[in-house]
Amino acid sequence: MHLHEYQAKDLLASYDVPIPPYWVVSSEEEGELLITKSGLDSAVVKVQVHAGGRGKHGGVIVAKSSAGILQAVAKLLGMHFTSNQTADGFLPVEKVLISPLVAIQREYYVAVIMDRKHRCPVLMLSKAGGMDIEEVAHSSPEQILTLPLTSYGHIYSYQLRQATKFMEWEGEVMHQGVQLIKKLAKCFYENDVSLLEINPLVLTLEGELLVLDSKITIDDNALYRHPNLEVLYDPSQENVRDVLAKQIGLSYIALSGNIGCIVNGAGLAMSTLDILKLHGGNAANFLDVGGGASQKQIQEAVSLVLSDESVKVLFINIFGGIMDCSVVASGLVAVMETRDQVVPTVIRLEGTNVELGKEIVQQSGIPCQFVSSMEEGARRAVELSM
């Protein structure tokens, strides 16, 4: 689960991480009230959306007067923000963050992330802050230091010495940097964070390290342990079908293809995406109905996939061990019989009650094609999608 910047800063502030003052407003009236109370005459105004690239795509405005701040608030609130990270077209801007301008001496990058290569959390540091870290990693990998942490977020003294030397922090700045890194690691571990990114971390002209921008992602599977974080979920920042899938208890991820997929089991679902790609097609979604889905959940799954207008073909790939094929068939038929236009459907059923499942579909008269293997099904689905 992604947090907005202001939510990430709220969480970091609870660990005494140094952050400049900031305010969040959701209307022009709130902006006017803030200016009146605070006397702000210069600030940076930033859209609050779950996407990067805000500065490059008009989502950040530097205002150098009170009137300029209000104009920025009016311009940004309600906009449809788009960047290279908004795959579904745009994200609505319902809130903006306002923070005073800071006199910057130098910018840094600091992050704690889960790293598959090291199979543990890692601390990443770079003196090339304020930039696209992916570009830095590609063009100048020597500018990034990666230090593996323990699974419980501990960082050793020798690693702290490595970090401060690499970042060229000395004296009081070194002390600030050490404390900051410890706090970030603690926040990461205690809140089941999968990504904690500070970009930029700045050194001010007064010699103070401050977090200017932050990004935090929480492990969805651990949210039950953090009710204080679970309530921060913002459905407006997600694909409508993603939100609906969460409500009905399905594992769904929207993709960019035109072949709708309904599969049981995450492994089989991933394999289905791969084999479609192998045959020249592209899946419109990842959807795992699991092993114990009810007929109602199957109906909801079919309706969910078909609500995507880009879907030209439906590929159902079920290997029924725990899953009952007749339940899948009944759910499919219940939805298809209510639709004016039926999407071409390719079905591969194997396992528990497979013959009964096929009989239910065939007796309904809905247009579909049964196949005997995933390979054959993928090939046929791709042909129909062209």
Curated annotation (Swiss-Prot):
- In the record, what terms sit under GO molecular function? ATP binding; magnesium ion binding; succinate-CoA ligase (ADP-forming) activity; succinate-CoA ligase (GDP-forming) activity
> Per its UniProt record, what SUPFAM superfamilies does this chain match?
Glutathione synthetase ATP-binding domain-like (SSF56059), Succinyl-CoA synthetase domains (SSF52210)
Top-level EC class as recorded in UniProt: ligase
Taken from the UniProt entry, a GO cellular component term is: succinate-CoA ligase complex
Q: Provide the alphabetized UniProt keywords.
A: ATP-binding, Ligase, Magnesium, Metal-binding, Nucleotide-binding, Tricarboxylic acid cycle
Q: Which cofactor does it need?
A: Mg(2+)
Residues bound to ATP? 46, 53-55, 102, 107
Source organism superkingdom: Bacteria
Stretch forming the signal peptide: none
Q: What does the record list as GO biological process?
A: succinyl-CoA metabolic process; tricarboxylic acid cycle
List residues binding substrate: 264, 321-323
Q: In which pathway does it act?
A: Carbohydrate metabolism; tricarboxylic acid cycle; succinate from succinyl-CoA (ligase route): step 1/1
The EC number(s) given in the record are 6.2.1.5
Domain ATP-grasp, first and last residues per copy: 9-244
* Database matches in PROSITE patterns: ATP_GRASP (PS50975), SUCCINYL_COA_LIG_3 (PS01217)
Does Phosphoprotein show up as a keyword for this record? Answer: no
> Can you state which reaction this protein catalyses?
succinate + ATP + CoA = succinyl-CoA + ADP + phosphate; GTP + succinate + CoA = succinyl-CoA + GDP + phosphate
Q: Do the record's keywords include Metal-binding? A: yes
Binding site residues for Mg(2+): 199, 213
Q: Pfam families attached here?
A: ATP-grasp_2, Ligase_CoA
The UniProt entry, under Gene3D superfamilies, shows: ATP-grasp fold, A domain, ATP-grasp fold, B domain, Succinyl-CoA synthetase domains
Function in brief: Succinyl-CoA synthetase functions in the citric acid cycle (TCA), coupling the hydrolysis of succinyl-CoA to the synthesis of either ATP or GTP and thus represents the only step of substrate-level phosphorylation in the TCA. The beta subunit provides nucleotide specificity of the enzyme and binds the substrate succinate, while the binding sites for coenzyme A and phosphate are found in the alpha subunit.
Quaternary assembly: Heterotetramer of two alpha and two beta subunits.
Q: Which family does it belong to?
A: Belongs to the succinate/malate CoA ligase beta subunit family.
PANTHER family the UniProt entry points to: SUCCINATE--COA LIGASE [GDP-FORMING] SUBUNIT BETA, MITOCHONDRIAL, SUCCINYL-COA SYNTHETASE BETA CHAIN
This protein is called Succinate--CoA ligase [ADP-forming] subunit beta
Q: Which organism is it from?
A: Chlamydia pneumoniae
Species classification: Bacteria, Pseudomonadati, Chlamydiota, Chlamydiia, Chlamydiales
